[in-house]
Amino acid sequence: MKNEIIERFTKYVQVDTQSDPNSDTCPSTPGQWTLAKMLVEELKAIGMEEVTIDENGYIMATLPANTDKDVPTIGFLAHMDTAPEFTGANVKPQIVENYDGNDIILNEALHIVLSPKDFPELANYKGHTLITTDGTTLLGADNKAGIAEIMTAMAYLIQHPEIKHGKVRVAFTPDEEIGRGPHKFDVAKFGAKYAYTVDGGPLGELEYESFNAAEAKIKFKGKNVHPGTAKGKMINSMKIAMEFHAQLPANEAPEHTEGYEGFYHLLSFQGNVEETALHYIIRDFDREQFEARKAKMREIAAKLQEKYGKERIAIEIKDQYYNMREKIEPVREVVDIAYEAMKNLNIEPKISPIRGGTDGSQLSYMGLPTPNIFTGGENFHGRYEYISVDNMIKATNVIIEIIKLFEQKA
């Protein structure tokens, strides 16, 4: 399984599938189509049935049941795109066999080093086979590791018909990183009772709570006058924007929060005297706190409108997704089986809230309860991203074990 999973994963990451929030197409980038076509061919080649790809790049496939029992159909999902924040072009994966616990030189020429001093969790990977970047791109383990693990699990089950299982559905989706993953996902066509996204990080991660999420866009209009004659006339839109930002609680930002704490995050600040635009994301696990955060932003905007004139400030807030716990708690079995699968394989499940969202956050509200399980990756979305092949194999085995447990319990 080791060589098979390395081969799959390193092949996928070499396709640039960075998504683009400024694109209106689906998928948002042509690279995602390139990978999608490869995956469709591979699904057919390993023997999956009902392999389809729709006009929006959503891939679905079936592993038919080989048992007479009435087993609920379950699904596994992973996303094809990589994060827009860091380049995914010309990824050159590097394989570190039997990691010794010391610094890993990612790029000698550029002096880029993956060091346990900066990333102490590297100590957990002594003796593992790691896959890293060459220091100039992200790796794309988020979420091509999930694709490789699902594909390898399906190939294994097809090669081992003695393992009894119900019907399994698989989906590979576009544009998760820009929050659009499930927007055009056909839950009815997928036809699963439960699903799992294989989109988590380190070994043992099992997540069924996500943020409630919104984005806020605030536009400030100023009045530009020659600075030499500006007294009493100029209105500097950037200064109003700074005033807005200064009224948000400084300690409620990503760099000061953890666990169940929510935040306001200023993503971009673009402006000049005449016009400035702020773009925020708002996150909280608690629904009431989430609503209070949005209200706080509107309140600050209203105060500044009073001070500078209503026409000078426009605020728009849009909800993006909600905490999936509300939809998963009532069908707790979907989490319990994943927990048991890990325990059966001597993996300690680590249940924690996702300080982010997955496609599962939205799918759970679309009628498909979808918790998230680990891939084995670390440091997603940047040049220090890496993954343990040993833990990729464990993730693959967890997928197989979940499928076996659903059949055994039917």
Curated annotation (Swiss-Prot):
* Role, per record: Cleaves the N-terminal amino acid of tripeptides.
Q: Where in the cell is it found?
A: Cytoplasm
Keywords associated with the record: Aminopeptidase, Cytoplasm, Hydrolase, Metal-binding, Metalloprotease, Protease, Zinc
- Which example biological process does GO assign this protein? proteolysis
Its name, as the record gives it, is Peptidase T
**Any binding details for the cofactor?**
Binds 2 Zn(2+) ions per subunit.
Output the Gene Ontology cellular-component terms. Answer: cytosol
* Binding sites annotated in the UniProt record for Zn(2+) 1: H79, D142, D199
Q: Where is the active site?
A: D81, E176
Q: Name one Pfam family in it.
A: M20_dimer
Top EC class of this enzyme: hydrolase
In terms of PROSITE patterns, this protein maps to:
ARGE_DAPE_CPG2_1, ARGE_DAPE_CPG2_2
Which co-factors does it depend on? Zn(2+)
Reactions catalysed, semicolon-separated, are: Release of the N-terminal residue from a tripeptide
InterPro entries (alphabetical) = ArgE/DapE_CS, Bact_exopeptidase_dim_dom, Peptidase_M20, Peptidase_M20_dimer, Peptidase_M20B
Q: Name one GO molecular function term.
A: zinc ion binding
Family that this chain belongs to: Belongs to the peptidase M20B family.
Which residues are Zn(2+) 2-binding? D142, E177, H381
Provide the E.C. number(s) assigned to this enzyme: 3.4.11.4
